[in-house]
UniProtKB/Swiss-Prot annotation:
Compartments it resides in: Secreted
Protein known as: Growth/differentiation factor 8
SMART domains: TGFB
Pfam families according to UniProt: TGF_beta, TGFb_propeptide
InterPro entries named among the record's database cross-references: Cystine-knot_cytokine, TGF-b_C, TGF-b_propeptide, TGF-beta-rel, TGFb_CS
SUPFAM superfamilies, per database record: Cystine-knot cytokines (SSF57501)
GO cellular component: extracellular space
Signal peptide range in chain numbering: 1-18
Gene Ontology terms, MF aspect: cytokine activity; growth factor activity; heparin binding; identical protein binding
Length: 375
């Protein structure tokens, strides 16, 4: 009993020396600590966002197999961009992001872009294949995007100038060949007859899939084609070499190639906004603006929602590998902590100019963060 009294006396003496406890001070310190934590989280998210934007630039160039961004001016784009139905449909009905679940988790995506449509503009043929020293329209060069994919569709698009009176137009597509003994330089590909009424000019498409497939099998046979569209008076209405005011009316090839479907896989994760106080791993919104990059060579989309992952990954939040939580409990010093990373990503469709001034419509995988998790 005497010992207990001594202990109580010592305890009371310590309280007197220490003075009264300020509960408000402790509360203020806690509040300041929380504010500091939130500021640090905001700063971390801002750094993560900046890093994500820079990574997207690098990824796009890499996935499109471009060493640098194509140097194409806005004026050049206006001249090269065809004013044609298939391109307008791609832009008007543009599907920037697919919300379906057909594209699965990150590990199921291929790295490089999948080409779906290639729009190839004509180039001038070399002197050896020109007839009588004059370039004949049109010569098309094909990139590996066409050569190493299955061609599903190939259409030659030509623009016919307007007529003043109703007339019948005879369209003929000729393939340039090596000179034969009788001097023949052409062989027919397709011919058709169509009626035109007064008014605006029209775009006409012609199936050239068989010819394209032959060219891909035997590239040396690709010497070019000639286009004729004669009215009843023998006037050629086809725009092969555009005159002033005819920008965007060049002939071109629209080639569609096969795409490979991907497997799907569902995942779960948190969604947050920029004002969220969530400290755990979460998906945050991020819009990529290609015009802000100065990337005029991307026709569409001009911007898209990429999103990014940020937040803490304590082992209790671990989603992808639950067994790691048990490992950490057994050996907390010997196991590395999880990171907040994308666990599900989806592609974007993109319409762009490549380095050869060809218009490509394709799918770039793993460009949109759909889910974030700790792994």
């Amino acid at each position: 009993m005497q010992k207990l009294q001594i202990y109580v006396y010592i305890y009371l003496s310590m309280l007197i020396v220490a003075g009264p406890v300020d509960l408000n001070e402790n509360s203020e310190q806690k509040e300041n600590g929380e504010k500091e934590g939130l500021c640090n989280a905001c700063l971390w998210r801002q750094n993560t966002k900046s890093s994500r934007l820079e990574a997207i630039k690098i990824q796009i160039l890499s996935k499109l197999r471009l060493e640098t961004a194509p140097n194409i001016s806005k004026d050049a784009i206006r001249q090269l961009l065809p004013k044609a139905p298939p391109l307008r449909e791609l832009i008007d009905q543009y599907d920037v992001q697919r919300d379906d679940s057909s594209d699965g988790s990150l590990e199921d995506d291929d790295y490089h872009a999948t080409t779906e449509t290639v729009i190839t503009m004509p180039t001038e043929s070399d002197l050896l294949t020109q007839v009588e020293g004059k370039p004949k329209c049109c010569f098309f060069q094909f990139s590996s995007k066409i050569q190493y994919n299955k061609v599903v569709k190939a259409q030659l698009w030509i623009y016919l100038r307007p007529v003043k009176t109703p007339t019948t137009v005879f369209v003929q597509i000729l393939r340039l060949i090596k000179p034969m003994k009788d001097g023949t330089r052409y062989t027919g590909i397709r011919s058709l007859k169509l009626d035109m009424n007064p008014g605006a000019g029209i775009w006409q498409s012609i199936d050239v899939k068989t010819v394209l497939q032959n060219w891909l099998k035997q590239p040396e046979s690709n010497l070019g084609i000639e286009i004729k569209a004669l009215d009843e008076n023998g006037h050629d209405l086809a725009v092969t070499f555009p005159e002033p005011g005819e920008d965007g009316l060049n002939p071109f090839l629209e080639v569609k190639v096969a795409d490979t479907p991907k497997r799907s896989r569902r995942d779960f994760g948190l969604d947050c906004d920029e004002h969220s106080t969530e400290s755990r791993c979460c998906r945050y919104p991020l819009t990529v603006d290609f015009e802000a990059f100065g990337w005029d060579w991307i026709i569409a989309p001009k911007r898209y929602k990429a999103n990014y992952c940020s937040g803490e990954c304590e082992f209790v939040f671990l989603q992808k590998y639950p067994h790691t939580h048990l490992v950490h409990q057994a050996n907390p010093r010997g196991s590395a902590g999880p990171c907040c990373t994308p666990t599900k990503m989806s592609p974007i469709n993109m319409l762009y100019f490549n380095g050869k001034e060809q218009i490509i419509y394709g799918k770039i995988p793993a460009m949109v963060v759909d889910r974030c998790g700790c792994s």
